Amino acid sequence: MATERYNPRDAEPRWQQKWNEDKVFETDNADPREKYYVLEMFPYPSGRIHMGHVRNYAMGDVVARYKRARGYNVLHPMGWDAFGMPAENAAMERGVHPASWTYQNIGSMKAQLKAMGLSLDWSREFATCDVEYYQHQQHLFLDFLEKGLVYRKQSKVNWDPVDNTVLANEQVIDGRGWRSGALVEQRELTQWFFKITDFSQDLLDALDTLDQWPEKVRLMQKNWIGRSEGLTIRWEIVPETAPAGESEVTVYTTRPDTLFGASFLAIAADHPLAKDAAAKNPEIEAFCDECRRAGTSLAALETAEKKGMDTGIRVRHPLDPSWELPVYIANFVLMDYGTGAIFGCPSGDQRDLDFARKYGLPVVAVVMPRDGDAASFSVGDTAYDGDGVMINSRFLDGKTTEEAFNIVADRLSAASLGNAPQGERKVNFRLRDWGISRQRYWGCPIPVIHCDDCGVVPVPKADLPVKLPDDVTFDQPGNPLDRHPTWRHVSCPNCGKDARRETDTMDTFVDSSWYFTRFTAPWEDKPTDPEAANRWLPVDQYIGGIEHAILHLLYSRFFTRAMRETGHVAATEPFKGLFTQGMVVHETYSRGAGASREWVAPADIRIDELDGKRRAFLLTNNEEVSIGSIEKMSKSKKNVVDPDDIIASYGADTARFFVLSDSPPERDVIWSEAGVEGAHRFTQRLWRLISEAADALSAVAPAPATDGEALSISQAAHKTLKAVQNDYDKLWFNKAVARIYELVNALAAPMTKVAAGEGDATYRAAVRDAAEILIQLVSPMTPHLAEECWAALGNEGLLARASWPQYDETLVIENSVVLPVQINGKKRAELTISRDADQNTVTDAVLDLDAVKNALNGQAPKKIIVVPQRIVNIVV
């Protein structure tokens, strides 16, 4: 066969068309084979895919193609997480309707994904903004409402007065809205909530069953759920300092053992006592307003300067009524955790210590390490928050912290304040119910109606879907649904009187909390086909970024439980296996400095090696630019590489192979032109080896050698097959690539020999067997090239439909051993030899090694010590 360079621009569209025509990747739910459901987190249709998408979807595609070849009935679908603020921003900034913007972007990104050659079942595609999707989400909402898993209540929210919308805690940065920069206000709004807290303990306990999830993700969820065992303690307010009608403060603590180290109580700015104090004191009122504007995310609380104001209120210590403590309003206490009040033990908590030092409050060490000295132990600038032995704690001295916890809990549970116990054991969770109300247009409408006579009335399921109106305007901030002249006005389903639709839409995290279930039967006229859902769920392998470790993954776990409670699925967990891949990162380039710094795109510079250093220059005028740090690809720093450009220049297989080959999949991959060119050279080399030998190989049937000259070829191929199979099972893509490179090197000479017409039929059959193994090993990563090579060998049918090869057990047995060779105790060489070689054979082979000959330099060894299958030592 005449050898030509492999042309991906010709081959890739041709094979994609063939796969599409043959519907190779469409999945039949009725197929009786064992199922395997692989899913990558579906993308937001921003308009273009980026290299992070390429890596994510290439990984999923390797798994899908490999499992399909192994005989599984594979489900590998794709859709679009299509609701959200960017579409509304585009509507405001460009005057384009969110639906038009979204569907146009979907069209562009779908074409890009198809160009990657992904083995996706596009027949199951949907976007979450499709009415056909969100009508079923409304159905689920109503089912959850009937089951008591949805409720409505007044809730304090972060309100952006410019964007006129609610912000999540994480979207408040230094008291300002993340997008508008406006000072955030605290408002009381009536919001819809999902009762995720009904499942707090179950969500926590079940983490132990998710043994195919990264430990880091499980730990993050465990901490987010935040189970703690503690004590609620009622503190009596000193009557002379008590506001009217108030007599006590309830505190929740996980460390009642440290009560004798208490020096203050701290309450949230929204605590009733704080509100009372603020009403009487303008300074306290201003401080409370400042606290409310600050971010309430965990990160914001941990990094903010600790501030407080003394309310003038005093409380009596629960273990010593003669001991009075001040009550402060503090900016690090939240009303929605515990009781909105804490006691501060400065010696045992760094935050409390910083606060106490700032405001001159006592610091008494009450816990020391077990090996500490009570006479000398003290707390300086660092609190001791560990377990240990009690000191300076009266009747608790000498007890362990665990013993002290129980003694205090028992004593306060037996004591009374008024008509109730002063203390009560309690399990608390950090997890809060999920507020899903958003004051936006581009989201799933909440299917309820508000009637003055009947109250909140669910939309009858027969009247679903509640569709978004198309005729909306974005010429002013706020929710267009509130301003629509007709959409919100309806008749009450109960009494028929005039009523109003709910104008809030659902948080977009709702859309992505059950999409994996819908993929199992997206044609159904109800949310799920339980039979299909129960067959396919849980997802066997879910792949996506670790930035979704908490919210999306936790919400999906809740949703699956809620859908089980309402009869839609039998599964408890949505994802059996989870893999969190690293990012694609790139060097940054810039010109200028400070405020005048201008970022430069990689495509606009060239890199030269001058005086042993890498230097960057603009292509246009040779101006030198600065080479910065390696960072996540981002539009803001222009360190992005367009996948379209890479595919146009090198082909999709090169892009896929590079992002899989250059680093472990859980780590970041550094994009480099040299790395891409190396991947491209590999594809060309593989094609050249196969195509040059194709005529000779197509004339023989593949058969591994059992002895003779070709045995080593078959051993190399079958050992690599076994190893790469294990690598694919464990998602070790970069290790698979390294082994494939080694096999290509091992086959280069035999393939060249066959291409030259040398070797007998047995030899050629062994080479063909090895070549086919090589092609199949690389096919999940470079599927177009593999199809081209497969066809070149004369194979009929698509490789995408072919079964995975089976390795020959007799060929993968390790019959050799590598022995370190020492001369006078210093390692000089290694000897690879048959495991059952006798001592004389080992000795002769060692003396024949070039490294040994050079080291001996003609000397005769005094002694050669052979430790069988371990080591050889030559004494000179």
Swiss-Prot record:
Gene3D superfamilies: 2.20.28.290, 3.10.20.590, HUPs, Isoleucyl-tRNA Synthetase, Domain 1, Valyl/Leucyl/Isoleucyl-tRNA synthetase, editing domain. SUPFAM superfamilies: Anticodon-binding domain of a subclass of class I aminoacyl-tRNA synthetases, Nucleotidylyl transferase, ValRS/IleRS/LeuRS editing domain. The keyword Glycoprotein does not apply. Its main location: cytoplasm. One of its GO terms (biological process) is leucyl-tRNA aminoacylation. A motif ('KMSKS' region) lies at residues 632-636. PROSITE patterns: AA_TRNA_LIGASE_I. It is found in: Cytoplasm. A motif ('HIGH' region) lies at residues 43-53. InterPro entries: aa-tRNA-synth_I_CS, aa-tRNA-synth_Ia, Leu-tRNA-ligase, Leu_tRNA-synth_edit, M/V/L/I-tRNA-synth_anticd-bd, Methionyl/Leucyl_tRNA_Synth, Rossmann-like_a/b/a_fold, tRNAsynth_Ia_anticodon-bd. It comes from the Bacteria. Keywords: Aminoacyl-tRNA synthetase, ATP-binding, Cytoplasm, Ligase, Nucleotide-binding, Protein biosynthesis. ATP binds at residue 635. It holds the Pfam family tRNA-synt_1g. GO terms for molecular function: aminoacyl-tRNA deacylase activity; ATP binding; leucine-tRNA ligase activity. One of its GO terms (cellular component) is cytosol. Belongs to the class-I aminoacyl-tRNA synthetase family. PANTHER family: LEUCINE--TRNA LIGASE, MITOCHONDRIAL, LEUCYL-TRNA SYNTHETASE. HAMAP family: Leu_tRNA_synth_B. This is Leucine--tRNA ligase 2. It comes from Rhizobium johnstonii (strain DSM 114642 / LMG 32736 / 3841). The gene is leuS2.
